[in-house]
C-alpha cells in the first residue's frame, strides 16, 4: 500500500510542484457508465474540480444519454457506476447488472490503454476476477463513500480516496487525476481486493453503530433515562463520536446501501466459512425495529431475481 497524503512531501511523487493550481491540470476524457447518484457525483465532481476542463460523457440505458460506444471511444477513464443490489432471498449480492455490461465495455477497451474504474460496490475478488476474464483491458477499483442526500458535496470533500489496482501504472494514472483535482483528500494506493474489503468494512461498521445505538435506546427506555443525554456524554469521547448514533422515528438503518451491503458481506463470509452471527443478529434486529423496509421499494437496491 502506498499513501499519498496532502500534508506530506510525497504529494510531489508525480513531479508536479503545485497540484492545487488549476492551470496545471491536464484535462482528461472521462466516461461514466450508469448515471444514478454515484455517476452524477463523479460527473459533477470532476467538472467542478477541473473548472470545466475535463470532457465528460455518460451512458445510462434508462436515461437520455450518449451511446455506450461513443462514451467509451471518447474516454480515457471509464467509471462504472452500475447498481449491485442484494438478492431477493437475502443470500448475498447480485452482480448480474455489472457482469452483463462488462463484455460490451471490454470489447471497446481491449488493447487501448483505457482504464475501467469500478465505482460500483462489489465484493472482494470481483475486480481481479474481471482482470482474469478480460486480460486485454485495464482495471482499477475506486470505491465511493457517499450519502445519497449529499453525494456531490461528499465527493468533492472526500477524506480519503482508495485506488485499488494490480498494475502500478494504472494505479498511478488514477491517483494523478484525483491528486490534481482534489487537493485535500488522502490517496491510498492498494490492491483491488483490499479496496473492495474497505468499502464493506466501512458500511458494515456504520450499520453496526446504528444498530448498537438502537439497542441502547431500547435499554434507556426500559430503565427510564434519556438516551439523548447518554449519547451526548458518551460521544464526547473522540474514539466514539456522535456520527450514526441518532435514533430516528423510523428506527434502525435503511436506504439503498447499508442493507444491501450488509447482506452482501454476510453472503461472502458464509462462502469463506467465517462466523456471521453478529451480522445476522444486526440484520434481523434491524428488520424487526425498522418501521418501513424502504430498501425493498428503492430501485436497484433489491434484485428481482
Q: What does each model-found stretch correspond to?
A:
Residues 14-73, 77:
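NAD(P)+-binding Rossmann beta1-loop-alpha1 motif at the extreme N-terminus of oxidoreductases
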Residues 82-83:
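Conserved NAD(P)H cofactor-binding loop of Rossmann-fold oxidoreductase domains
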Residues 14-18, 23-25, 52, 130-140, ...:
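Internal alpha-helical scaffold of NAD(P)-dependent oxidoreductase catalytic cores
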Amino acid at each position: 500500500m502506498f499513501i499519498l497524503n496532502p500534508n506530506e512531501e510525497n504529494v510531489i511523487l508525480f513531479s508536479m510542484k503545485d497540484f492545487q493550481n488549476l492551470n496545471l491540470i491536464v484535462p482528461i476524457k472521462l466516461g461514466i457508465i450508469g448515471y444514478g447518484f454515484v455517476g452524477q457525483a463523479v460527473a459533477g465532481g470532476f467538472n467542478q474540480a477541473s473548472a470545466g476542463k475535463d470532457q465528460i460523457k455518460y451512458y445510462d440505458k434508462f436515461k437520455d444519454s450518449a451511446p455506450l460506444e461513443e462514451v467509451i471511444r471518447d474516454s480515457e477513464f471509464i467509471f462504472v457506476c452500475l447498481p449491485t443490489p442484494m438478492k431477493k432471498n437475502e443470500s448475498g449480492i447480485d452482480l448480474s447488472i455489472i457482469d452483463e455490461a462488462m463484455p460490451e465495455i471490454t470489447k471497446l477497451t481491449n488493447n487501448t490503454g483505457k482504464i475501467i474504474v469500478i465505482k460500483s460496490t462489489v465484493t472482494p475478488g470481483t475486480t481481479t476476477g474481471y482482470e482474469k476474464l478480460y486480460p486485454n483491458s485495464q482495471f482499477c477499483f475506486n470505491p465511493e463513500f457517499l450519502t445519497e442526500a449529499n453525494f456531490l458535496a461528499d465527493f468533492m470533500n472526500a477524506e480519503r480516496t482508495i485506488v485499488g489496482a494490480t498494475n502500478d501504472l494504472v494505479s498511478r494514472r488514477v491517483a494523478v487525476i484525483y491528486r490534481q483535482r482534489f487537493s485535500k483528500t488522502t490517496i491510498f494506493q492498494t490492491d483491488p481486493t483490499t479496496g473492495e474489503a474497505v468499502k464493506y468494512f466501512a458500511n458494515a461498521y456504520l450499520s453496526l453503530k446504528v444498530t448498537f445505538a438502537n439497542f441502547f435506546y431500547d435499554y434507556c427506555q426500559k430503565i427510564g433515562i434519556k438516551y439523548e443525554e447518554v449519547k451526548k456524554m458518551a460521544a464526547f469521547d473522540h474514539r466514539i463520536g456522535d456520527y450514526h448514533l441518532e435514533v430516528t422515528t423510523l428506527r434502525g438503518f435503511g436506504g439503498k446501501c447499508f442493507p444491501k451491503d450488509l447482506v452482501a458481506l454476510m453472503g461472502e463470509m458464509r462462502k469463506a466459512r467465517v462466523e456471521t452471527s453478529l451480522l445476522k443478529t444486526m440484520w434481523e434486529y434491524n428488520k424487526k425495529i425498522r418501521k418501513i423496509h424502504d430498501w425493498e421499494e428503492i430501485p436497484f437496491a433489491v434484485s428481482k431475481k
